[in-house]
Each structure stands twice: as structure tokens, then as C-alpha cells.
Amino acid sequence: MKAAVLHEFGQSLQIEEVDIPTPGAGEIVVKMQASGVCHTDLHAVEGDWPVKPSPPFIPGHEGVGLITAVGEGVTHVKEGDRVGVAWLYSACGHCTHCLGGWETLCESQQNSGYSVNGSFAEYVLANANYVGIIPESVDSIEIAPVLCAGVTVYKGLKMTDTKPGDWVVISGIGGLGHMAVQYAIAMGLNVAAVDIDDDKLAFAKKLGAKVTVNAKNTDPAEYLQKEIGGAHGALVTAVSAKAFDQALSMLRRGGTLVCNGLPPGDFPVSIFDTVLNGITIRGSIVGTRLDLQESLDMAAAGKVKATVTAEPLENINDIFERMRQGKIEGRIVIDYTM
């Protein structure tokens, strides 16, 4: 089969022929129809996170395709079913986090395209218990980004503890942020979009954001405190440490900041203001299997639609270069029919 393989951090991926995997007990083989390209994939090939993958490996964790082989003991899915291969490849199932419904915090988890080979290949091996069931009504290309970008922001919004009618800030209207705006509106929230690009803010407005702020020429905290009295929650998807710092000041008393983006560096936190204003700061990483299925179902219901551009696997290195330069609008999806 054809696959994009990374042999050395920071180098180009090589398109090469590798063996089609064989499923073991509890595993399935999925023939890819589509795979989203995520910023996490870029971190994987650069090797710039503290916990690194081990080359050679195949990145990718937003894969959609049809099951072609089923391993021993798999009974809830079958050959021909369309499934999604997401970031969470597997977890131990018996630690405190797994037993409490927080398998995304399992210290023994494996991750697609990082600790195990991922979806930048014509066939991918998956753990049958951790794939998402793709609703029949949706297109594989359009649904692929939900497997990471979608579930990540959906879970992040849930972590803000906001309720219908509350205000939520979405900071960073890129691949994740434009989906976050839609999920937030579907959840009954009022959206204030913050970015430094007028085109992205115009897009957020088109998607239904009630307030937009360009943080490049306006102090977003001062503006939002004046216009809406501060937000009940803020979800930061931007890859800028400054955005996290700014978001804290956009909250009203009792507000919650949820961190989704993963830029390098730190951001300052005023102990006095955090205590006095009852502010909560949370990190949120992807989502559980339940979060994944809920986010897929919301997209299938037409409440959320990623802006996607389809390209062939052979373009992967060029895609990563555009990603480095911030030149990608929405999400890029690998189309395995191209």
C-alpha cells in the first residue's frame, strides 16, 4: 500500500510502498477514503513536543474509511462498515481515569499517527473499540476533520461549563476555531470571536458569531468587558501564548478559560485576580469516545460543517509547508481517490 512515512524529524515525508497491516485480536483494518491534516501531525513530524514519536512512523489521526478485515473477538463492527480513526487509538481501560470516563487522560494510552501508525496511508490498523461510527448521511471528506478538530473544540466547549444563553469567546478562528463557532451556536451559546485576521472574523460573523474583535488593533478584553460584561467562558484554539493571556481578561467573574491550542511557551496568571474573580483555568485534550460520537452526530445533523479542501497524499509535504506559514484556510483533507 502507499503511505507517507517520516524517517527523521524535520525532514520531508517519503511516499513509499509498505505492507498492508494484518489485524490481531480486537483490531480492524480500515481502507482509507479520507484523512484530515491536523497541526498535531506537523508537531509529530517536527518532533517538537516534549513527548516524541519514534521514527519511522506514519502520521495522521483524522481517518475515515471502510473496514476490510476484522480480527478475533471483534463483534460490534464488521467488514464494510464506515468508521473513523481518531487520535485516541486505545487506552488501558482499568486505571482511575479510564474507569471514570476520562480515557483521554490515561497514562498508558496510544495515539494514532504518533505512538502507532496513522491514517496517512491507504490502509490503517485500528483498535475496534476506539473507532467512531460514521453516520450514513455524511460525506467522508467533510466529516474527517470532526475526528480531531471537531471533537477537540466540542469537548473544550463542554469544559467551559457554559449553558444556553451564556457568552463564550472563541479565540483563534482557524481550523479548530471555525468549527468551535458552529458547535457553540449549536449548543445555544452566544459567540464572541477573536482573531487578528479580518477575513477570519468576517467568516466567524457569517457562521453566526454575534460579536467579533480584531485583537491586532483593539484590546479584546476591554472591548468585551464593555460590550457584553465579559464572557462566561473562553475557548482558546490559537497557537499564540498571548491569546491565552488575553483570554483571561475577557472573562467575567466566575468565568472559565479552556485551553485547546498548544503553542510553545507560557502565559502569566495573576494569582490575585484569579482568586478574587473566581476564575477557572482548564486544559482540554481531544475528547472521549462519547464526545467523539456526539460531535459526529451533531455534524451529521447539519449543525456543523468544516470548511475543507481536498488534496492527494502526494501533496503532504507542501501542505505542511503551508501550515507552517499559516496559509491554510479551514482544513485540508487527503482524498484517497485522487
From Swiss-Prot:
Leading EC class: oxidoreductase
For this protein, the Enzyme Commission number is: 1.1.1.1
How does temperature influence activity? Answer: Is a very thermostable, cold-adapted enzyme. Is active from 10 to at least 53 degrees Celsius and unfolds at 89 degrees Celsius.
Residues engaged in binding Zn(2+) 2? 92, 95, 98, 106
Which SMART domains does the UniProt record give?
A: PKS_ER
| Keywords (A to Z) from UniProt | Metal-binding, NAD, Oxidoreductase, Zinc
Output the CDD domains linked to this UniProt entry.
Answer: CAD3
Q: Which domain of life is it from?
A: Bacteria
Q: Which reaction(s) are listed as its catalytic activity?
A: a primary alcohol + NAD(+) = an aldehyde + NADH + H(+); a secondary alcohol + NAD(+) = a ketone + NADH + H(+); ethanol + NAD(+) = acetaldehyde + NADH + H(+); 1-propanol + NAD(+) = propanal + NADH + H(+)
Q: Where does Zn(2+) 1 bind?
A: 38, 61-62, 148
* The record's free-text note on cofactor binding: Binds 2 Zn(2+) ions per subunit. One metal ion is located at the active-site region and has been termed catalytic, while the second metal ion has been termed structural.
Cofactor field = Zn(2+)
According to the record's subunit comment, the protein's assembly and interactions are:
Homotetramer.
Instruction: Reproduce the free-text note on domains from the UniProt record.
Output: Each subunit comprises two distinct structural domains: the catalytic domain (residues 1-150 and 288-340/345) and the nucleotide-binding domain (residues 151-287).
Show the PANTHER family listed in the entry. Answer: ALCOHOL DEHYDROGENASE 1-RELATED, VACUOLAR PROTEIN SORTING-ASSOCIATED PROTEIN 11
- Listed name of the protein: Alcohol dehydrogenase
The species is Moraxella sp. (strain TAE123)
Give the gene name. adh
